[in-house]
Amino acid sequence: MEMKEPARLSRKKMFAVIGILAGILIALVIMLYLMIIALGNRNEANLLEAGQALHYTYDSHNAPNGMTLHVLKTRPADVTLETINNNITLSGKVGINGGFFYGEQLLSIGVVDSIPVNKEIGSFGTGSENVKYARGTLVWDGASDLLSVQVASKASELKVKDHTRFWAQGGISMSLGDDARWVEQTVKENAPFPGDDRLRSAAVYDEAGMLYLIVSETKGTLASFREAIIQTVGEGKLVDGIFLDGDGSSQLLSSDASLPGDNRPVVQMIRIVK
């Protein structure tokens, strides 16, 4: 009996089979992508699991000038300064970036209870001074539970009631109470790239002594960032604050938001710990 050769698939059926196989492959790729995203989100949630009990609130604001701000509001007593040498979004720690740095050297004041936060590095870049310039430094006096901005070159110049109960974060004066001369002050303090559109960070406080840690999602000049803060943060009751390191160093992590800047590591952060 003569065996017939199996009929070849028609061109139409062949395209149909190829289409089905391609569809299955695309579906598998999408499922794998979603699994990776879900795993990443779960890992971030696990990292911040202990942070869910922290005393802070998160909010975001779209300012009239187009800047989008992410804000962590907390009490200064619930905050510390910490060296991390990592991107904040990878640290598992709630907070934002801190002062200026170069390599692993901290170029801004960063002290807690009179101890420089980067003291392990040696004699330079420890956080004991605002290198080269007297700059606006946000100071929390634990004895009086009050915040202030003091222009200083060295941490030893700062005025507090008890030098064993305070923290101080260096930056650039924002001069919220002096709209006429704030730009002049930033020039004195050599604020970097004030006219460029860059990511920005800041720490400000209100009349009730609440602390606002702010990172922009959109780029803007120093002036537009300051304007956005005045317009959207603190319900018109802000007292003063400082600009922090910016651009790729502008980073934030909370259970609600994750802003990695340009993914670079930063030396130091302002961390919410209570």
Placement of each model-derived feature along the sequence:
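Active-site-adjacent helix-turn-beta-strand microarchitecture at beta-sheet edges
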Residues: 105-194
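Zymogen propeptides
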Residues: 2-143
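Conserved, well-ordered active-site substructure
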Residues: 106-130, 189-205, 211-244, 249-274
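Beta-strand-turn-beta hairpins that frame and shape the catalytic cleft
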Residues: 64-67, 143-146, 206-212
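Short hydrophobic-aromatic micro-motifs
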Residues: 71-74, 94-96, 147-148, 174-175, ...
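Fold-independent oxyanion-binding glycine-rich loops
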Residues: 74-76, 97-100, 136, 141-143, ...
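Mature, Sec-exported extracytoplasmic domains of Gram-positive
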Residues: 59-66, 75-77, 104, 175, ...
